[in-house]
Amino acid sequence: MPQRLICILCLCGFVFAAMPGVWLDVPFIKQEKDGCGAASIAMVMQYWRKQQAKAVDAAADAVEIQRALYSRKDHGIRASDLEHYFQQHGFQTFAFEGKWDDLKQHLEKGRPLIAALKPSSLESSLHFVVVVGIDPAEGVVYLNDAAQRKLLKQDRSSFERQWSAGKHWTLLALPK
């Protein structure tokens, strides 16, 4: 019996070690109407609070973030407001034009990213998602999409098309 258990554990370890992708366990928050930006901020803030073993405070509450930043004119939250909110709450931010390799690099370091997508169903608005995983061998990315679900699997070409329409806008927020 003990030998069998050891074999099973070794086999499981081999299977997990053979997985070429990376995935971060970022909390998922469902968005309110036009609330993808607020939910994305909340997911990333709660992830870092958990990593630092800190209690989640009101600053990481999607409803409060939406109330503070929502623009009726823009039907959501502007990308620059995402950055400012993080900065006001003790985070360093880096907004950049992302590339596929940037996703892998940051995720391997345990850093989730917020990406601006422009799905064809949205005429002029951007849709913010949290990039939580990538599997280059399969050519897929995993998203916490506040409008849909946690760990939404999207093929690279579809993601790149929507990300390109959003000018590859990417936000890295790190606790100070």
Indicate residue ranges for each PLM-predicted region.
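Mid-length scaffold segments of soluble, non-membrane domains
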Residues: 65-113
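Short non-domain terminal segments
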Residues: 12-14, 94, 157
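Active-site-adjacent structural segments surrounding the nucleophilic cysteine of cysteine proteases
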Residues: 2-5, 11-75, 79, 100, ...
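A generic structural signal for short, solvent-exposed coil/turn residues
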Residues: 9-12, 85, 107, 123, ...
